[in-house]
């Protein structure tokens, strides 16, 4: 079973592949997608053993499921980063029979073959009321000896947010030679990086493409440090360019590796590895030093430049709420992300996971106040800092997301994609994708911050007003990035105001258009008086999924367009939107042209900065 929120449970698929010839039957259940109850699953499969893979966030839920399994007489085995770090804690719960520490393939095979954990390396268990830790199992040095993950056991369609693209995961290496104090990987791999051969990885990629029957595919290289061995990445890129695959790859990389290897970055982008997520962490050198990141801020910009010059998309993650950070420092993070040219960014709250140096330091000082493992999710503050309260840190995470994910960033994303594809984005596709993104962020934000969701929305709105959006859209012509020629011709000169409101907090998006151009987009607080079309949205709707009052909401949406002129302008907007929808649907029903090879060279360099 797996609780992986954003990744396919490939670790369990590796284990299943390694043990399936020794057991009568094996099933993989992804609890993020499973709609049946756990008791129903027990009844259907009648398992002898249930293995649960988890992180710290799933600690409580895993114990709940293990308890159900034990009530049905099923042996329970727990594994993953979290159990590896706290095996005694896991075994203190009677519903846990065994813990697999470290890599699971060989240990699980021995457990099912022997039927006992005695003398099985990497296993922890109870004997006569005492916890026994067998010796650690040596790491698997030759990863090519492992069978490929058992994708055929999947019970669920893994799709992109807009449901148009298949998704998959692959791993080229295990471990990381980094020593970041907040990361779980050093405790698992002890700075040791092991790689599969590029030929072995390429063979799996071809099998994976066949499994998805040639459909468009988005694949994440889930390696903690994909560029840990640049020569192997270089060779894999050569192999990928020998095939015309309908696959776009994303990789997790270190900024210093991307800065040092511009030629390999160029080759990766030509080969279809076009999306990159880097641990930027902070624009402040003191934060990079205190977390033992092992890089300087100088490489941030160099890495992004190398990616963008080759048509790639550069994303970065930041850590906020470190022990000595101030609110003023954190407020600079989203600005810095835009300045160095990131087109995607996430701002996670510093979380001390067991097994990390970060956890040991804070635990020693008695600073960790949170006892509910559910909140160890990088969305909640769980320890005391020098300058900021728990509530303030969580608000700052919302502030950073709002400041970065503004309209200028969304347009910049399309500008980068256009650089690679040579095509403008259709307006309907742009709106559909952004609506999907907003819905995803809202639903998950509502779930994770449900006790204070209203305040977070207000913080989001207050942070969203930004004069840089207008400056950006005056400089970067929207009509050159989005295909809106027909839309603007029908709409004509307008000043459209879309006002978002929550209680007394309002923010306005103002779109100034002519027959041929979008002159600017302005994001500002309060209602603007000189608009030609008004659209009002009450954000309380976000927390009210019931659509029974849809007519009432539509009336409210257009309630500030009562004059004859504004009604006419609103009609023109409706016709323009309807025309775009009709054209989009007609386009979708036409036979699609053959997709150009992934290894086509980008047309021209991108600007280094989003602003």
Q: Residues of each region from the PLM?
A:
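Radical SAM [4Fe-4S] cluster-binding motif and immediate context
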Residues: 148-315, 322, 328, 332-335
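Feature captures hydrophobic
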Residues: 449-611
């Amino acid at each position: 079973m797996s609780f992986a929120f954003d990744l396919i449970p490939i670790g369990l698929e590796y284990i299943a592949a390694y043990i399936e010839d020794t057991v009568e039957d094996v099933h993989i259940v992804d609890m993020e997608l499973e709609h049946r109850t756990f008791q129903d699953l027990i009844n259907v499969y009648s398992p002898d053993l249930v293995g649960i893979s988890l992180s710290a966030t799933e600690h409580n839920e895993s114990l709940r499921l293990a308890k159900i399994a034990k009530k049905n007489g099923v042996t329970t085995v727990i594994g993953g980063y979290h159990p590896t770090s706290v095996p005694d804690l896991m075994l203190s719960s009677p519903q846990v029979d065994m813990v697999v520490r470290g890599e699971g393939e060989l240990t699980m095979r021995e457990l099912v073959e022997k039927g006992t954990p005695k003398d099985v390396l990497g296993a922890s268990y109870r004997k006569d009321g005492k916890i026994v830790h067998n010796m650690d199992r040596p790491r698997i040095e030759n990863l090519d000896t492992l069978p490929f993950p058992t994708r055929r056991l999947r019970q669920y369609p893994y799709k992109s947010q807009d449901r148009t693209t298949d998704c998959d995961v692959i791993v080229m290496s295990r471990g990381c030679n980094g020593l970041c104090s907040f990361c779980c990987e050093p405790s698992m791999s002890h700075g040791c990086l092991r790689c599969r051969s590029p030929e072995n990885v390429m063979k799996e990629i071809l099998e994976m493409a066949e499994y998805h029957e040639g459909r468009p595919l988005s694949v994440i290289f889930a390696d903690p440090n994909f560029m840990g061995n640049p020569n192997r990445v270089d060779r894999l890129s050569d192999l990928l360019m020998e095939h015309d695959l309908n696959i776009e790859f994303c990789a997790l990389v270190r900024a210093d590796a991307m800065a040092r290897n511009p030629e390999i970055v160029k080759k990766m982008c030509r080969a279809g590895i076009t999306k990159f997520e880097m641990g930027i962490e902070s624009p402040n050198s003191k934060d990079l030093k205190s977390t033992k990141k092992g890089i300087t801020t100088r490489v941030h910009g160099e890495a992004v430049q190398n990616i963008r010059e080759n048509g790639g998309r550069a994303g970065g993650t930041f850590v906020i709420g470190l022990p000595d950070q101030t609110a003023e420092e954190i407020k600079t993070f989203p600005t810095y992300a835009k300045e160095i040219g990131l087109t995607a960014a996430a701002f996670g709250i510093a979380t001390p996971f067991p097994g990390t140096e970060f956890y040991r330091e804070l635990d020693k000082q008695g600073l960790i106040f949170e006892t509910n493992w559910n909140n160890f999710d990088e969305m909640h503050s769980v320890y005391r800092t020098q300058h900021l309260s728990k509530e303030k840190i969580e608000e700052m995470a919302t502030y950073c997301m709002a400041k970065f994910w503004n309209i200028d960033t969304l347009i910049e994303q399309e500008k980068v994609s256009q650089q690679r594809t040579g095509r403008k984005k259709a307006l309907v596709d742009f709106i559909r994708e952004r609506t999907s993104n907003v819905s995803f962020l809202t639903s998950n934000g509502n779930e994770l911050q449900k006790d204070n969701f209203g305040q977070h929305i207000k913080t989001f709105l207050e942070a969203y007003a930004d004069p840089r959006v207008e400056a950006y859209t005056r400089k970067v012509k929207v009509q050159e990035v989005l295909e809106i020629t027909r839309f603007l011709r029908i709409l004509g000169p307008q000043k459209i105001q879309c006002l978002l409101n929550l209680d007394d907090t309002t923010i306005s998006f103002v779109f100034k258009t002519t027959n041929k151009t979008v002159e600017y987009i302005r994001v500002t607080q309060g209602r603007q008086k000189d608009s030609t079309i008004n659209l009002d949205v009450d954000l309380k709707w976000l927390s009210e999924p019931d659509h029974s009052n849809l007519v009432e909401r539509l009336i409210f949406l257009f309630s500030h367009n009562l004059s004859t002129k504004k009604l006419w302008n609103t009609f023109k907007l409706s016709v323009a939107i309807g025309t775009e929808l009709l054209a989009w649907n007609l386009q979708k029903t036409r036979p699609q042209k053959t997709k150009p090879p992934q290894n086509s060279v980008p047309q021209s360099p991108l600007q280094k900065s989003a602003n």
